[in-house]
Amino acid sequence: MVKVTFLGHAAFYIEGSKKILIDPFLSGNPVASAKPDDFKSVDLILVTHAHGDHLGDVGTIAKRTGAKVVAMYDLANYIAEKYKGVETIGMNYGPTKVDEVEIVQVPAWHSSSDGKYSIGNACGYIVKLDGVTIYHAGDTYVFKDMELFAELYGPIDVALLPIGGHFTMGVREAAKAVELLKPRHVIPMHYNTWPPIAADPEEFKKLVGEKAKVVILKPGESLEL
């Protein structure tokens, strides 16, 4: 069994034979269901890009737990320099295996910076853990290559998709992404954290219809697969 817990915004905690955090923005997150100190055991932290609402508490958690941090090559170097002693794994799109976890770093259409300087490119991740395939889109607009992700790495058991608009896909675009990805389940994310990304997940669910099972999670709630 693999348990996927929504922590708020774009942060998720995945538990199986390994424990994985994705985009651990907890401190300063107005909708977060957890604090950095709540995580006692983390094997891997995946970061989609350098914006603060995704990089979040990566340094604090990685230092305390010894988790390895997976990120775009440039961002991995930035993290290693900023948080001395943290083990990073830099990638530049493509597949790898870390501690028996299969990871594919895939493109995302978004920027990546620390607010001043550009730090590599944005990405998403396809993770296969204990036979379950999870796609975290990161921050992105919909794009046709999502269809290729499904062809190469599917079937996707659960897709974690932004629906808030303004900086990412909105509900209409995310529903189109579901058509391309063909996942069994979809969890909407990156919405209602702040007014610019206000969105109605029920509207998204209606647009998706029978194409996938939309699971609307409140921060702290989980889907078991």
Curated annotation (Swiss-Prot):
Gene3D superfamilies: Ribonuclease Z/Hydroxyacylglutathione hydrolase-like
Superkingdom per UniProt: Archaea
InterPro entries registered for this protein in UniProt: Metallo-B-lactamas (IPR001279), RibonucZ/Hydroxyglut_hydro (IPR036866), UPF0173 (IPR022877), UPF0173_UPF0282_UlaG_hydrolase (IPR050114)
Xref: SMART domains: Lactamase_B
One Pfam family hit: Lactamase_B_3
Keyword Hydrolase part of the UniProt annotation: yes
Cross-referenced SUPFAM superfamilies: Metallo-hydrolase/oxidoreductase
One Gene Ontology molecular-function label: hydrolase activity
Keywords, alphabetical: Hydrolase
Membership in a protein family: Belongs to the UPF0173 family.
HAMAP family, per the entry: UPF0173
Protein name from the UniProt record: UPF0173 metal-dependent hydrolase PF1764
Native species: Pyrococcus furiosus (strain ATCC 43587 / DSM 3638 / JCM 8422 / Vc1)
